[in-house]
């Protein structure tokens, strides 16, 4: 399964928040009726028409895992480049991303430490401070919050990235990228583990001091989000993980 989004950021945001601000979705960019829309008919009503992010879904209806799903998802994303936006700097976009199932086989090969059975651990990419010292402090704060929520941090992985594809503005505010792996010593799995992680993630977003500000697009036992301040073609180029067929 893959869910692909090309985002629109509807309001100005501080530069330091841009990489996380691409989670913002517009819900009503069309304020006036479009005369070209069809008339109300059946369940359709033009009043419900709104401009927003472009979203595609790619899945295997038989539940077969395949890297083709990721590949087709990235292709669908690139076909929706018109749903994103750029300014005068054509190689800095306002955001794009992909949500996929946790690639357990791949993560076991690259994590560098032992992982529990699928569903018994969670993973997410953290957008940490670009300064190495502040990022280290943020990691310590995150581990403390996780422990306070009854969770155990299994470890961190530095996410490989290639910023050479990005525009100057995106590089100027680029955070550092770390994958966080978490489990519950009490044995919570799946949706039960995700509920505990939701609380921890919200605490991380609200409790860390400004210099340690960290954002997790996702933190889940079931799915993982790769996203950033991209034009749609830049996503796959920036994250080499997405090219790995495992």
Q: What do these predicted ranges mean?
A:
Residues 2-246:
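N-terminal segments that mediate ammonia production and transfer
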